[in-house]
Design a protein with these regions (language model features):
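Cytosolic, long alpha-helical scaffolding segments
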Residues: 1-160
Length: 160
């Protein structure tokens, strides 16, 4: 919030069009990173609710959530690398878009299998609800990562 407030003050000052666009990109990045933090908090809250309800995940669910966490971790690592780079290459930016596709596809795959697994009593309905809440939040986190990458890409286009 303090960073966003400062950037809003900067935009109100005397800046060139390019300067204002750069600050707007920074504001987008700050907002989206805050949303990433909110996703992490929501994941923790979901796990707490699951724990409070005495619901257990079977090994398959745990493995699938771990795989989604790995995809998110890779997306976050690439985002941090892009943020750290003065001039990220388009090939590095494309890695993020590809990772986002992987996250979306994996979410879709798990969502489809979830209904079938509940119907086949592979696990309880309530386990499936918490499971899909976790997977959806992980996918949302990936969306926020790609929004940061979009803002980085916009900055690069304006500088080119």
């Amino acid at each position: 919030l303090e960073i966003a407030g400062f950037l809003n003050l900067v935009v109100g000052g005397r800046l060139s069009y390019e300067g204002k666009m750069m600050v707007n990109s920074m504001l987008t990045i700050v907002t989206e990173i805050e949303s990433i933090g909110d996703c992490c908090y929501n994941l923790a809250r979901t796990l707490q609710r699951k724990q409070d309800s005495h619901i257990d995940f079977n090994d398959e669910i745990v493995s699938n959530i771990d795989a989604m966490f790995k995809l998110d971790s890779e997306a976050l690592s690439n985002m941090v690398a892009l943020l750290s780079s003065n001039e990220p290459l388009m090939s590095e930016i494309m890695i993020s878009y590809n990772k986002e596709c992987e996250i979306n596809n994996y979410r879709n795959q798990l969502r489809g299998a979830n209904v079938e697994n509940i119907n086949n009593k592979h696990y309880e309905y309530q386990s499936g609800i918490y499971y899909m809440d976790m997977i959806s939040e992980c996918e949302r986190l990936g969306d926020y990562v790609i929004n940061v990458v979009d803002a980085i890409k916009q900055q690069q286009v304006k500088h080119a």
